[in-house]
Amino acid sequence: MVDITDFFKKTNKADSSQAFNQVRINIASPEQIRSWSYGEVTKPETINYRTFKPEKDGLFCAKIFGPVKDYECLCGKYKRMKYRGIVCEKCGVEVTTSKVRRERMGHIELASPIAHIWFVRSLPSRISILLDMNLKDLERVIYFEAYIVMDPGLSPLHKGDLLTEEMLQQAQNEYGEDNFIVGIGAEAIRTLLAELDLKSLRNALQEEVNNVINSDFKRKKILRRLKLIEDFIGSGNKPEWMIVTVLPIIPPELRPLVMLDAGRFASSDLNELYRRLINRNNRLKYLKKEEDGVPGIVLRNEQRMVQLSADTLFDNGKRGKAVKNSNKRPFKSLSDMLKGKQGRFRQNLLGKRVDYSGRSVIVVGPELKLHQCGLPKQMALELFKPFVYAELERCGIATTIKAAKRIVELGTPDVWNALAKVIKHHPVLLNRAPTLHCLSIQAFEPVLIEDKAIQLHPLVCTAFNADFDGDQMAVHVPLSTEAQLEARVLMMSTNNILSPANGRPIIVPDKDIVLGLYYLTLSIDGEIGEGRLFGSMAEIHHALFNKVVSLHSKIKFRKHIINADGDKVMALVNTTPGRLMLGELLPDGDNISFDVVNKVMTKKGISAIVDMVYRYYGQKATVVFADKLMKLGFKYACISGISFGMDDMIVPETKSKHVNDTLLEVQEFERQYSEGLITSGEKYNKVIDAWSRYTDRVANDMMKGIAAGDQTSVGLTNQERLNSIFMMADSEARSSVTQIKQLIGSKGLIAKASGEIIDRPILSNFCEGLTVFECFIGIPGTRKGLADTAVKTKVSGHLSRKLSESAHGYFVKREDCGTTNGLIITAVVEGGVIVVTLAEQVLGRVAVSNVYCPITKVLILQQGEMIDEYKVELINTAGINSIKVRSVLTCELQEGVCAKCYGRDLSTGKLVAIGTAVGIVAAQSIGEPGTQLTMRTFHIGGAATRGVEASSFEAIVDGRVKIINPNFVVNSNNKSVIMSRSCEVILADNVGQEITRYKAQYGSILLVTDGQEVTKGTSLVAWDPYAMPIVTEKSGYVMFKDMIDGVSVKDIIDESTGIVNRVIIEPKQGRGEVVLRPRICLLDQNKQPLTLSNGLEAEYFLPVNSILSVEEGANVSAGDILARIPREFAGTKDITGGLPRVIELFEARKPKNHAVIAEIDGCVKFGKDYKSKRRLILQPNDECQEPIEYILPKGRHVTVNEGDVVKKGDMLIEGSPVLQDILKVMGVEALGLYIINEIQAVYRLQGVKIDNKHIEVIITRMLQKVEITDSGDSNFVIEEKVNKREVINTNKKLKVKGLREAQYRPILQGITKASLQTQSFISAASFQETTRVLTEAAIAGKVDKLEGLKENVIVGQTIPAGTGFYINEIKKIARQRDKEIIAAKDAELQENNTEA
């Protein structure tokens, strides 16, 4: 452990005794400050303006802080190294290096104590809590506005009472001057703090907290004070040290004074702040020495001035207005030097400027190999200069470094030869900003080029997210052998084949390469040489050369294939010469079937091939294959001559028909609206959906049209008829259906700046041209897209930073933790469609237990086995629906995670290595797509993308229906209306194995019966997507209750139609009036209330905004709709809409209009209502449990009725559930699965794939704290939030001693809070709220064990991840071995001494 000031001192790496592994921060005592100091600064002067030498005893004094020049005293008497260590008797300066001016500190002896503003103003104010005072009262004492009673003596005053000048005069007159003692200023506060007996105060508070029962506020206040006292006792700090009597002065080199032209100086603001303080302090000292006596008011004013100048020095602007300089800019105080982006932490310690680096524009280098980059000669010479000098000297071309320098300046051929030798096998690092993930920095072998731009291999563009429209990249040279080795082994572009985010290949061909391969693998009817038979590739090349066949001719080829029995046989294959040329590139072997390349190649297909080559043949073969693929793609992209032409833009003929059909639909909705059948909101949603369907239909016809090619021109070959635009879109090389739809279909629906969709689409396309009106409504959406790019990129970037901050200290620490817990993984189903298969989710995970085939009972997976591609195929074949796998969330390691719980390292495809920084990888994987997708918005130009609202579930395969909880009634239209809130429709195969299940919502129509056999596409359940119905269970007559016009119900007249809708409103009631609960009651023919199946009256409560569908007195049948609750209008679905949801989840914020969930299984009852709240009581099934009462807002729709049976976790009010509630009720696993599904839904919408384990890592960091519910015999305070690891370790010690253990419950924190409350105060301080974090840490005397990445970077040590992890492990083993050897030697010596 080291003192924090030792950071100023240079550590000698060779001397291991100076190395440290933890750092403690404390409040400095006056004695400690004096021990740091090399002398007292008594003068405010800096340097002499004539001699430019530091003034003696001033802020730059050479006697105190050290010599200005190396080994030279100020007066010049002693010069050079031979006098090292001598103190000049004339000027008093020690002869040493000038670097000591960066380390040596001075001090000021204050004439009057001052309160440190961090302990006064940093909320909560530590001094005010400790003295149990109000902050305003404390400030009045410190700033000499009021006196405080320190000892009441014989007077009736109390200790701590505040007295103004008048009150003091009155008290002195009444009780006498000597009968009580008062004080003022920081000195009085210091005395009060020094008088505190912390241990007895702690005992008194512990008793007091046990006696407080009713007041929650009072209890929290006592606990806060108790926690602070515990911190002081534990750290050894004394409370009076928060009042400063000796002020340290930081070394002069850290607050420089720089000479500019024309004799002017630029000075750090700190010098001015110190100068003001010294002047005031000196004046106060002088006033105190005056024998005549200075009036008290003058003295107090001067003391206040000293306090104010100290406040400005510590934290300018913390209290009142910031003090400004002559340029009207606030002075930069010590606090400002630390915090923010320009502060010491983020500017100088975490982000340093790098030597041996350069930057230039990038251009494409298609002739490079994957591991190479083109480096301009001049740039390379500048970067590798020292190496070139050494090479010239070694070869005997230059005798000295000076001579080598001259030769390099001349630029002789020897220099270039030396440079070529030097850079051979010396990798360089290329970095493209923004560095969003680890693939933004990769290593390459440089190839010297004559240009002035860096050449980049096309296949790494995806990883760097680079294009060649003016992008720049930085080059860095790894200097040491270790750095070069790491660059080559870990960072080489050939090692970065798979994406760490999802495990898919990232060096996949793109753009023109894909287009070339697509063209090459096309199969066209009627081409020359169709039907010919070939036996070898030589024949194919010969035939192509002689133009006997074309690339696209349908031919037969004799080839070895693997048959169904797994035997190698010769067979004739129907293919094309182009596909055979692609197949020729595959590595030798039979692992990849020719069928994989015997089809038209799109981007997805090519990616699949690269993936297969990597899995079956390894890294080297993949790199070679990718390079060959790229060259082939470029070649045929060039030969194809595919280009973008006006004639390729064919507007679909059916467009006008689709427009007319949709207009008729819209007119029908207008009619329904004008007749009052639907509301304005429902009409809006239906119109939006109609136009969404229209654009989809036009897009389909458009793609069919351009796929058919040019059928009108005469004399064209089939190849010439191909449509270039279709080929670009179909191959996924360039453009997308969305963009082509705007060109030759319809631009479609447009979003307003607010995100709401305009219900009138742009029917024209860019090929036909827009009307003035269409252009006008299209402009805001386009501009919004561009504005979003700027605004949302910042939001996404901040999310990335917060994620990294919360997870940077999370590594793989062990091979296996031995847990038997895990997550049960099933396929993700949305609207009855499997969007993510089980196989995709479990790939690369480790099985918790043995998995058997449900039919044959054959063992498929063993416990502890990793699920690879082969096992995934077996799982699919066996039809398994769920598997329990190891998860980061359930890992039982106290620190970090074990390799088995993490599973596969997605960037290598193997089990994760110990020491991998999985936290950082997770943060980058989640943050990077967010940034990318916000930047992608502007390519679509404001067109709104919104999926049509689902209104039914359809069978995804043939099967048999099974209905669970089938509570339904048959309505007047002979339809089965579901009345249960827990009804589920299960689709099973012929064997009875469940394929998928659908949760049928209340009020939906059941279209099938239990046990019915259905075919694929059959509708199972249907519902109204725009409104939630309130349905009657019984037939009867309607009676309204508590519906008073203008009070609880309102007639809303639609201005455009004149239709009146009766809408429930928030009842306007005064105090003491009867509470109104608008509801519909059902009566029988005798006007008596009907009873439901649960024995209660048939009453249906109506929430605010529900629209009545029946009139009073109407006769209704069971299953009829009484009222409708409109759903919200839909906005656009894109990442800018989704990112706030992701942030809301990661920050664990409470959603607006959140859901309320049932905490236990039980029966619903409604209690007596409050004025604006409803009381719901959940009667538990278990009689041992207490009923739970929920107070619900009246306006919200309660999804349950009286007598309903609910399960734990069911929603009582609709909305997004609060994450903390899920954790409390359902546990960690349920919380994890909910967050994963919600976040994946946002990214899935954009086609981004992120592995679940990355989200799991972040959730684990959010769950690292627990709340103490019972402190037992520990030092923890009840309701204190502590690190889980700390509690477990404490409990272990208590258990050994036979004492009571502390009880706790898990709590969920947002990533920002988790980052600020991390174990490392250095990491937290460098993130946000620097002053608050350091204040807290200093009081508690926190120890930073330097376990994360940031804290090690800040203190300049090797990070404990990757290579650093193994170095640390080797050092640990070596230390242990040394201890054992020393212990053995000691024992041997002792034995020898005994014998002697």
UniProtKB/Swiss-Prot annotation:
Binds 1 Mg(2+) ion per subunit. Binds 2 Zn(2+) ions per subunit. HAMAP family: RNApol_bact_RpoC (MF_01322). Keywords: DNA-directed RNA polymerase, Magnesium, Metal-binding, Nucleotidyltransferase, Transcription, Transferase, Zinc. Belongs to the RNA polymerase beta' chain family. Mg(2+) binds at residues 467, 469, 471. Zn(2+) 2 binds at residues 817, 891, 898, 901. GO terms for cellular component: DNA-directed RNA polymerase complex. It catalyses: RNA(n) + a ribonucleoside 5'-triphosphate = RNA(n+1) + diphosphate. Its cofactor is Mg(2+); Zn(2+). Its EC number is 2.7.7.6. DNA-dependent RNA polymerase catalyzes the transcription of DNA into RNA using the four ribonucleoside triphosphates as substrates. The gene is rpoC. The RNAP catalytic core consists of 2 alpha, 1 beta, 1 beta' and 1 omega subunit. When a sigma factor is associated with the core the holoenzyme is formed, which can initiate transcription. InterPro entries: DNA-dir_RpoC_beta_prime, DNA-dir_RpoC_beta_prime_bact, RNA_pol_asu, RNA_pol_N, RNA_pol_Rpb1_1, RNA_pol_Rpb1_3, RNA_pol_Rpb1_3_sf, RNA_pol_Rpb1_4. It holds the Pfam family RNA_pol_Rpb1_3. The lineage of its organism: Bacteria, Pseudomonadati, Pseudomonadota, Alphaproteobacteria, Rickettsiales. It is an enzyme of class 2 (transferase). GO terms for molecular function: DNA binding; DNA-directed RNA polymerase activity; magnesium ion binding; zinc ion binding. GO terms for biological process: DNA-templated transcription. This is DNA-directed RNA polymerase subunit beta'. It comes from Orientia tsutsugamushi (strain Boryong) (Rickettsia tsutsugamushi). Zn(2+) 1 binds at residues 73, 75, 88, 91.
